[in-house]
C-alpha cells in the first residue's frame, strides 16, 4: 500500500445533550487529526496518508459541521447517509422501508448533500434498505445516480458490505448506475488493519457488480 486514507465518522454538534453512539465526540476530534498528522509526517517517505471524515448530510446542522471542520487540515469528506432527517429526529437508513415517501426523502436528502460541493464521493449509496416496489426503487435511484453523474460524484461499492454480508452492495442499484453511466470506486471501509487485505472483496465486486 502506497496511499492510505483515514475517514472516521465525523463528530456532529447537535443541540442539547444528544450524542451519536457511532461517532467520535467533538472534543475528541483534535486528537484524531493530531495523531494522523504525526503518522503522515513520520512515514512520509514510505506512504502517502490522507486525513478525512465520513459524514452524513444533516440539513439543520451541516453548516455548523463545516464551520467546525474548517479549523482542521482535512483532505476530503465522504458522504455516508446512515440516518434520515437530522439523525436524532429521524430513522436509520438500515431499517426496512416499503413506502415510497421514505425512499423519496432519502434520495432527496442525498441529492441536497451532493449540491453542497463538500463531498468527494458517497459511501454505500445503496445503504437505504428499501424493500418495496422495484419500479419505485428504480425511479428514485435513477434520480440519485443522475444527480451524482451531473455533479461528478463517484458512487462507492462498499467492501464492508461484502465482507459482513450486509444488505448492500445491491446489484439492482449498480445496474442502474451502469445504465446512467456513473463513475464507481471501491471502498475497503476497513475498521481494522487486517481488513486492508481486501482481495476477496475486490474479486467479488469485479464478478458481481
What are these regions (language model features)?
Residues 1, 69, 113, 148, ...:
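Generic structural signal for hydrophobic
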Residues 1-55, 131-145, 152, 159, ...:
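An N-terminally biased module of ancient metal coordination in phosphate/nucleic-acid-related enzymes
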Residues 2-3, 75, 120:
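Short acidic/polar active-site loop segments enriched in Thr and Asp
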Residues 18-22, 66, 170-173, 199-203:
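Short low-complexity, flexible loop/linker segments enriched in glycine and/or proline
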Residues 43-45, 72, 150-151, 180:
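Helix C-cap/helix->beta junction micro-motif
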Residues 48-92:
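Hydrophobic alpha-helical segments and helix pairs
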Residues 78-180:
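Domain-core and long-helix interface of multi-subunit machines
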Residues 173-209:
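Long, positively charged, glycine-interspersed low-complexity recognition regions
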Amino acid at each position: 500500500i502506497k496511499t492510505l486514507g483515514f475517514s472516521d465518522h465525523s463528530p456532529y454538534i447537535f443541540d442539547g445533550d444528544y450524542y451519536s453512539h457511532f461517532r467520535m465526540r467533538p472534543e475528541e476530534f483534535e486528537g484524531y487529526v493530531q495523531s494522523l498528522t504525526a503518522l503522515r509526517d513520520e512515514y512520509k517517505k514510505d506512504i502517502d496518508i490522507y486525513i478525512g471524515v465520513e459524514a452524513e448530510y444533516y440539513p439543520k446542522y451541516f453548516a455548523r459541521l463545516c464551520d467546525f471542520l474548517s479549523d482542521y487540515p482535512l483532505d476530503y469528506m465522504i458522504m455516508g447517509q446512515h440516518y434520515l432527517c437530522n439523525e436524532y429526529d429521524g430513522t436509520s437508513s438500515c431499517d426496512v422501508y416499503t413506502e415510497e415517501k421514505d425512499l423519496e426523502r432519502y434520495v432527496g436528502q442525498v441529492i441536497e448533500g451532493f449540491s453542497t460541493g463538500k463531498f468527494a464521493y458517497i459511501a454505500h449509496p445503496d445503504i437505504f434498505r428499501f424493500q418495496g416496489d422495484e419500479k419505485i426503487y428504480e425511479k428514485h435511484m435513477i434520480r440519485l445516480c443522475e444527480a451524482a453523474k451531473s455533479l461528478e460524484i463517484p458512487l462507492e461499492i462498499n467492501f464492508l458490505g461484502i465482507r459482513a454480508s450486509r444488505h448492500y452492495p445491491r446489484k439492482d442499484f449498480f445496474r442502474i448506475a451502469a445504465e446512467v453511466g456513473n463513475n464507481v470506486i471501491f471502498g475497503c471501509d476497513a475498521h481494522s488493519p487486517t481488513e486492508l487485505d481486501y482481495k476477496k472483496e475486490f474479486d467479488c465486486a469485479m464478478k458481481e457488480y
